[in-house]
Amino acid sequence: MVVTAMDARRPVVLLELNELTPSIMDRFIAEGRLPNFKRLRDRSEVFVTDAEERPPYLEPWIQWVTVHTGVPYSEHKVFRLSEGHKAPQKRIWDLVSQAGGAVWVCGSMNCRYDPGTRGWVLPDPWSTDAEPYPDALLPYFRFVQRNVQEYTNDRVPLTKADYLNFVRFMVGNGLSAGTAASIARQLIAEKKARGGRWRRAFILEELQLDLFSAVYRRLKPSFSTFFLNSTAHMQHRYWRYMEPELFKVPVSKEKQREYQSAILDGYRAMDKLVGRILKLIGDDVVVIMATALSQQSCLDYEETGGKRAYRPKEFSELINFAGITSPHRVSPVMAEQFWIHFENNADASAAQKRLEALQVGGQSAMRVKRDESGVFAACCLRHEISPDTVLQVVESDRSIPFFDLFYAMEGGKSGMHHPDGILWIRHPEREPAIHSEKVGLRSIAPTILETLGIEKPEYMKGSSLFPPATPSVPRERVEV
């Protein structure tokens, strides 16, 4: 590997703002609602990316692995969330660390990292097999992981001691007065209105930026990432409240009032964080903002009442009802999905059959896949279920009210994935420009490596967006 004076190169910060949508971004900027996004866009080269995948391979945990490795799904083969460690290719941060640069990976989805990494790595909160590095990050990682994995559940499995340990960690690792004030306002608002708990996602990301900022100042990394997901969640759950005219299923006036601004609130919350990041890193750092993919309205289920999702209230109760008795460990993932890890393949195979035997009205209730000694499962029912629905075990007299074991996730699902994504690159040595031709996600890793003076590995077939002989095409500069 050839390295050309990395220490003299400009650092690179990769902002990973999952699934933000180009058309919504442009609309909110035009309305004057996102001043910091506008400032970044006006100083960047602007691209639209193509994920170059279609369902079932159009998923963020697949696309982000492509961004980080520079190879498509057909080569990295990572299909599920929390399986990032299975991809053999090195990530961008592995190559930077190997070249002698410090790295700070803050929340990147489906990540893995080489032993002895020069820097800090905080995996995404859905990771079940990845641990943060160094161990000093464990109090933060475990607290956020439980909050995110149980975000839709009223009962988050955290003790007073867990909260106290987390507060101690944050006080020593960047907790800002602004974030503390946001927490206080959120708790007061929840108590007064007895609702609005969904806004806690924005608070968690303020905390994440506090931590990112503290480590960034301490480490001064050559390459860093910062991942955010709250707005992707808002788009999935609340698109119908943003554009109710597109949907056939009516919503109550009360819910319309509460959720009509949820997506806008998500973009505005991220806009504030982007402003803080730009202030933190200054004007001399290369900033790359990517979304990997985006979303669009999900209208496919309107004839059957809209797309629904159901999640176990307590995984142990569902597993006991299914008749699974082998030693196991449950790891919630995203939304309704979860892993059950067993001690051997035989136990996992037996558990798979028991979960597949659960039915509602003659229809399978669970989608189940086994991967060696692990079982990946989720409720596969997508229609509205009546309160008196019964969950049954096939070829037995065992049954239980469905809602004794499951709850309906708030908001249903009214946003779905789209292969287009946002890519803005602010390079102090290049002119702002708008590029009309779409680019593949595989070009992002080579672009970052070239910016840092690191030769890309042979397995990366994509080309840098900044080949030395190709200048950017300038556009009229907009002063802000």
Sequence positions of predicted segments:
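Membrane-interface soluble catalytic domains
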Residues: 2-8, 79-81, 89, 94, ...
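Short secondary-structure boundary/capping segments
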Residues: 28-32, 119-123, 240-244, 300-311
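Short, hydrophobic/glycine-enriched beta-strand segments
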Residues: 11-18
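Metal-dependent active-site segment of extracytoplasmic phospho-/sulfohydrolases and closely related
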Residues: 36, 265-304, 423, 448
